[in-house]
């Protein structure tokens, strides 16, 4: 379930949409995302264009990218090149050789960059920094109210 903090923040910024489109639901289902997850609820209801900007970084509006870009191809390439397990989906364009990844099985979010962090992650030595998507989004938008 999406946290009340995220919902209130989204509403206050004019990003919250009560209606869910079938197209966005289908986009998430094509990625194997549970529509009742906090991840799905965020992307089904919150939108500020194709990306969200905060902390000098941007993350995708995943549904928009699945529908309007080559996200599925990029996803395949990411898994093949970086050797990241298939349950991890990128939340951004891997800017500056680093990026955020959502684990669709556990709900955890991970930030890794090319080099030692990627190697440690692949060896099981680096664990996701956020235990769930809510805590990641609350951190990403840097709010506490």
Language-model features: locations:
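N-terminal processing/targeting junctions
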Residues: 108, 142-145
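Compact, glycine/acidic-enriched structural inserts
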Residues: 115-143
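A surface-exposed partner-binding patch
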Residues: 1-100, 143-144
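Helix N-cap / beta->alpha transition motif
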Residues: 66-69, 103, 125-126, 132
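Intrinsically disordered, low-complexity regulatory segments enriched in Ser/Thr/Pro
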Residues: 105-119
